[in-house]
Amino acid sequence: MEKETCKIDFVVPWVDSSDPAWIEQYNHYRPEKPITDRGRFRNWDIFRYWFRAVEQYAPWVNKVYLVTNGTFPEWVNAECPKLVLVRHEDYIPEKFLPTFSSHTIELNMDKIPGLSEHFVYFNDDMYINAPVVPEDYFRNGLPCDCNAETLYSCPWYDPIDRFGIKIIMFCDMAVVNRHFSRRAAVKQAPRQWFGPHLWGKSFLSSLMQTGLESFEFFRWRHSEQPLLKSVIREVWEKEAQLMEESCARFRKEVSLNQYVFRFWQFASNRFYPSKMDSRAAIGLSLGNVEKICRILEEGKMKSICLNDSPYCTDEEALKVERRLQEAFKKKFPLKSMFEK
């Protein structure tokens, strides 16, 4: 396997959801729907371990861009040569600020000053869990990813989560289908669409969609995402109006999010086909916390996403938080260069 030589940056946004000033500003701009759902805005106090994992398991990273509304963790070492502190106003156009929508933060990432063409986007709940190499994210200058296809299934409505993220990803797919033909993409690079990186059901799904002009849907993989900055700029060039409409102060159910970049990379064959099967995504709950701790201890999965859940009560959350902190402290006991 040839070694990847391009510079690779990491980007991770973060907000101190327990900051009274942030909560006050949020409620000022949204008085009709103030913060009441703690499941959406809990601070588990484990973010420092994200950086310890990066130093231990991805020491090759070029730069780490920490994106916030201007408030940074008090323990962050601003003098760290690998760390770049980015405020929303440093790259997001003023007309979109202040913003409380992750979509606005994500859709403008190409404007982050100094960001490399090749970067990996993390949410602050996505942790590297074992040694990774540049080739886990990019090969031949292309993002490693698995274009596992599926037929679109209508999401079910939930009174708390409403329509969820699937409606937004439906919008992402619709935009991609406006600009690309599935038939043309497969003809251009058939091994991208029928290669050994696809497992049984996914390979069968690709066969079932043979000859279709439009893409149906791609399996949702909630983990860190390798991206090309040039693809983000291309989407802005092609769909400026819709991208601007998606950069709202608060998340809208009908809008685009960063998955449009992933789908665009697939449709334009700008990806390196990979299995990407060593990733885990688990909801944070009292019933799942021991499973999470086992994954952390075993270190078999290369990364793990710890999804917040609105169904986790405050009492349960305290128990989960204590157990998580114990597990992370045991796995990463030493401070990283990113900490004071």
Regions from the PLM with identified roles:
Residues 1-120, 127-340:
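ER/Golgi luminal nucleotide-sugar-dependent glycosyltransferases, focusing on the catalytic module
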